[in-house]
Amino acid sequence: MGNRVSREDFEWVYTDQPHADRRREILAKYPEIKSLMKPDPNLIWIIIMMVLTQLAAFYIVKDLDWKWVIFGAYAFGSCINHSMTLGIHEIAHNAAFGNCKAMWNRWFGMFANLPIGIPYSVSFKSYHMDHHRYLGADGVDVDIPTDFEGWFFCTAFRKFIWVILQPLFYAFRPLFINPKPITYLEVINTVAQVTFDILIYYFLGIKSLVYMLAASLLGLGLHPISGHFIAEHYMFLKGHETYSYYGPLNLLTFNVGYHNEHHDFPNIPGKSLPLVRKIAAEYYDNLPHYNSWIKVLYDFVMDDTISPYSRMKRHQKGEMVLE
């Protein structure tokens, strides 16, 4: 557990990300894929039901012993809240109401944010669009760990701690890599979320509030679903920047595992990404992919060649248009 990883820097590359070229090739060969570029109305009802489910859980846990509050937060609430963050990811791509009703998606994202307890849906949208446009770009893509993370979390034990603390790094990393001015929508998001948290505490008590926050922190840390954070872009095979996952947890995560497909076609809702793979099978079947996020987490911690430095990084060329 004390061996240092062999990597001492990111994998600097001088080529463009592969997704734009593959998207052009696939659309030229299979133009019918354009018919999948439309919102998913079912997403709206799924998100509403998830919010109502957590509201019911807040009520149930208010009188439980503390041990059951924490157990429930990890065993049940964490799955709902992590899944909700991926629902917010779908909403960030305007998958709920479509591009023509962009603001409806922003308001709905704030609604979906409520049971998570921490305001982030508006900020996430801004940074996530940069992640797609400028994948791996130094000083722009905040999905890339900081140099400190790569330098410090360099043993199996430290990488294990890094996995546990993932939600904190995702929350604070943008402030160090690519800080942006606060927008009025972020203020509204924050006011709405803080008001909701206060109401939960006032009407249901501290246990419900702790359950909500613990479900988010535990669900985004050492949790099977959190394997997607690492599986998506950490370079387990040299030269491969994005990896898909085709295991059963896609059922809980809006098919976020179909990540090559998602980066190739970010305006196609998650529910249709398996169809993209089916139509253009020759483009995806031979790409390296995963079937277990748990194994990804284990390999990340135990493999001395993998660390937070295991990301492809590039100096962005030309003028950037940031969200």
From Swiss-Prot:
Query: GO terms for CC?
Result: endoplasmic reticulum membrane; mitochondrial membrane
Question: For this protein, what reaction is catalysed?
Answer: an N-acylsphinganine + 2 Fe(II)-[cytochrome b5] + O2 + 2 H(+) = an N-acylsphing-4-enine + 2 Fe(III)-[cytochrome b5] + 2 H2O; all-trans-retinol = 11-cis-retinol; all-trans-retinol = 9-cis-retinol; all-trans-retinol = 13-cis-retinol
Q: Name one GO molecular function term.
A: sphingolipid delta-4 desaturase activity
Query: Where on this chain is Histidine box-1 (motif)?
Result: 89-93
Q: How does it sit in the membrane?
A: Multi-pass membrane protein
Q: What does this protein do?
A: Has sphingolipid-delta-4-desaturase activity. Converts D-erythro-sphinganine to D-erythro-sphingosine (E-sphing-4-enine). Catalyzes the equilibrium isomerization of retinols.
Similarity comment: Belongs to the fatty acid desaturase type 1 family. DEGS subfamily.
Provide the positions where the record notes the PTM Phosphoserine: S307
What is the taxonomic lineage of the source species?
Eukaryota, Metazoa, Chordata, Craniata, Vertebrata
Cleavable signal peptide? none
Please report, in chain numbering, the residue ranges of the motif Histidine box-3: 259-263
Q: Where is the lipid attached (N-myristoyl glycine)?
A: G2
- The name under which this protein is listed is Sphingolipid delta(4)-desaturase DES1
Q: Where are the transmembrane segments?
A: 41-61, 68-88, 107-127, 152-172, 184-204, 209-229
| Alphabetically ordered keywords of this record | Endoplasmic reticulum, Fatty acid biosynthesis, Fatty acid metabolism, Isomerase, Lipid biosynthesis, Lipid metabolism, Lipoprotein, Membrane, Mitochondrion, Myristate, Oxidoreductase, Phosphoprotein, Transmembrane, Transmembrane helix
Enzyme Commission number(s): 1.14.19.17, 5.2.1.-
Explain the post-translational modification: Myristoylation can target the enzyme to the mitochondria leading to an increase in ceramide levels.
For this protein, the record's InterPro entries field holds:
DES1/DES2 (IPR011388), FA_desaturase_dom (IPR005804), Sphingolipid_d4-desaturase_N (IPR013866)
Question: What CDD domains does the record point to?
Answer: Delta4-sphingolipid-FADS-like
